[in-house]
Amino acid sequence: YSPSNPVTRAQMATFLWRAAGEPAPMGAHGFTDIPPNSYYETAVTWLIEQHITSGTSPGKYSPSNPVTRAQMATFLWRSNCPPAPPISALAVGGSHSCAIKEDRTVSCSGRNTSGQLGNGTANQSLSPTPVTGLADVTTISAGLQTSCAVKSDGTAACWGYNASGQLGDGTLTQRLTPTPVAELTDVTAISAGTDHSCALSQSGTVSCWGANGNGQLGDNTLDGISTPKPVPGLSDVTAISVGDRFSCALTSGGTVFCWGYNVFGHLGNGTTDQKLTPAPVSGLSGVTAISAGAQHACAVKSDTTAVCWGDNSGRLGNGIIDRSSTPTAVSGLDNVKTISAGVKQSCAVKLDGTAVCWGSNAYGQVGDGTNEDRLTPQPVSGLTHADTIGTGSFHSCALKQDDTAVCWGANYNGQFGDGTNTSRLTPTPVFNV
């Protein structure tokens, strides 16, 4: 038996896997130093799926390395601790993140200087903290310093920064806990941006509120308002997305309208002129999903390809850095399920459950194990079985098909919710403490 011999990481993986009953893993491990068909390959794959280990460095498991006492303790604790509570939806904000749990309550983590975590304090939290008094939530959105949620009865609530009235409660008062959005009773979706918010009604109409210095409320004025105001001329809307001082809407016919700030061409109408009312995105039809970032936007088409427009520096994914005021195809990307535009990065989930990201990567928000900016889509390292994806200022997160979540990029404020403020170049399990 060789009881005095040191235990390798390969052997430890095998011990744990066999102790669990040799379960069959669903996906792939993503490591380059695991020989195919090795005695420990299945065990390591299972460890990855159970979030017991993420390797020693990007793409490396180091199977021959001895297991330290610290690693042994961590392996055993993670293999025996209760699983993370299921997550039904994930929202990624500027430097915070929020999740809807199986019981339809909400928890948030990360930066909290304006109360965007909704827990009654202004203290940041490295671990998920429950949003006070919020239940029966169906959908959620995280903005730069605000958060908003829709409840099953069609009402909405927001919390956090409110200097422009973006919480929609008729005041400019910052809120540390959820406050009802005035006058809304039939909401199906909500989107929080930098200084304004918009909501979609069951009837397919849109209302917006907050700052309006660039026409982002779409009401043909530049007057801000702290309660919801209908966007005229929009009907049959199926999805909305709010960015930095601009808004976009997708209609049932597959067309997209955007309005507001446009200095980078991110309204997609071929100009850089701001629009006070919704304007169609040029040459775009057959759209199934949209996402508005800080100064760019992206869409998924019915043929499962993706396009982006606006400011670039890599975030359009077309291989160049020049901005575009009309939609441009994301290079080499097809079989797209959903897409998310962040501040300077974009990410997409493919139909096979893998994910890709592109754009600025200074904080590792592309998730490819490097800090190199990417002008075209790059696979997110080791991520399989992804369902949805979200992008913030400098971090990105994905909700997986097993209702667990992973994040990568900047974590200085604890926005991962993993109990640390350690940033990551590749996905790490989150909202699990």
Feature roles, as predicted:
Residues 92, 100, 139-142, 150, ...:
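Residue-level recognition of a conserved intra-blade site in WD40 beta-propeller repeats
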Residues 1-43, 54-69, 78-84:
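Feature responds to low-complexity, polar/acidic, surface-exposed segments characteristic
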Residues 56, 110-127, 159-177, 210-227, ...:
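Short glycine/serine- and acidic-residue-enriched loop/turn motifs that recur at repeat junctions
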Residues 4, 76-115, 119-122, 128-129, ...:
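An edge-strand/N-cap motif at the start of beta-rich repeat modules
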Residues 96-99, 108, 146-149, 158, ...:
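Conserved core positions of repeat-based scaffolds
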Residues 51:
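Phosphate/pyrophosphate-binding loop motifs in nucleotide- or prenyl diphosphate-using proteins
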